[in-house]
Amino acid sequence: MNIDILLGLQWGDEGKGKIVDAISPEYDIIARFQGGPNAGHSLEINNVKHVLHLIPSGIFHPEKLNIIGNGVVIDPAVFKKEIENLGPSVEELTKRLIISTRANLILPGHRILDAAYEHSKGRTKIGSTLKGIGPAYTDKVARNGLRAGEILRKDFRELYDEHLKSHLSLLRNFDFKFEITEYEAGWFEGIDMLKKFRIVNTEYLINELTGKGRKLLAEGAQGTMLDIDFGSYPFVTSSNTISAGACTGLGISPKRIGEVFGIFKAYCTRVGSGPFPTELNDETGNALRNLGHEFGSTTGRPRRCGWLDLPALKYAIMINGVTRLFMTKGDILSGFKTIKVCTGYRTEGKECLEIPFTNQAIEPVYTELPGWEENISEIREFNKLPENLRNYISFVEEQTGVPVTIVSVGADREETIFRK
């Protein structure tokens, strides 16, 4: 069992990119298994911030093989821009990155349909990133998608034109103005960039390499509470963000899975619409947002902020089979005199520990813990952390039954405590 999974346990933005980069030296292969450019994995290396949307976070390690799996949806225009912004030459990056033939493409029509759908919902918008993710996955499930392997066909342009005709026909049902020509030109430039990379049947490659002992880390995008089945539906993404998605998104057997690493923030954030029981619409919420620089890596939208939600965290741990917890953003809580943790909900006058099926109004039940004043960004040993922070972590461990083995104390890859 030399395949491990790393994923988010909240509503995304937990710090997956930084942690993947930090633990990449332990692996030979880093593979994305779902999502698309709606993801924004931020990592800071030598005080330089990088944001990855499609490319696995192991790309900054020259000796690692990075794979975009079949469960990912790829926007060629975004892919091209991301490759050009990375730093290393395209020739060098072609040695580090491989793409699945089965990964579906996000077409220009998908982006326009996404915007048209969201615009038509008015006040009932779900908070789409407008990247074409939903329509691309819709076409995939309807068996009407274009896949990366098809860009190598001689009749690819004809295939594309058929899809565009279908999308334009759908758009006639909406009172929505759009322009496609300029984006389409950039999209085809992205197709040319994709052709420079190896596009192969990655399910065979992954099973062959891991069968020979190579270690693989499957990198999730978004978070458990945005999962299409188990998230706060309909305010969710269009893919399975949970650990089971790694099997279908890479072509690996469940019996090959070893560890499942779950990342959570020391508090909670959410972008877009949808239920958020511990949301703070006050000065404390604003303080968390400003101190934590809580603005979306993909959209730039301000994130909604709130206290840690333990029932939601325990739900995510259960669904994913998490074996180890990694906590980020503990440094942002420095300076708070008291810190609240949601340990249950109150609905219709009754207390409960389970997340309700419907998106009804629920009131969080809090436990208060003492805060800490110290700046922890320079600390590299767990036992040197403030006592109250260690107690906070112990409280989470006691409540969840899972050990916290990594504590992030800052944005840079070096600002990480590996706890033995």
Name every feature range the model reports, one short phrase each.
Residues 1-420:
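Non-transmembrane, aqueous-exposed alpha-helical and coiled segments at domain scale
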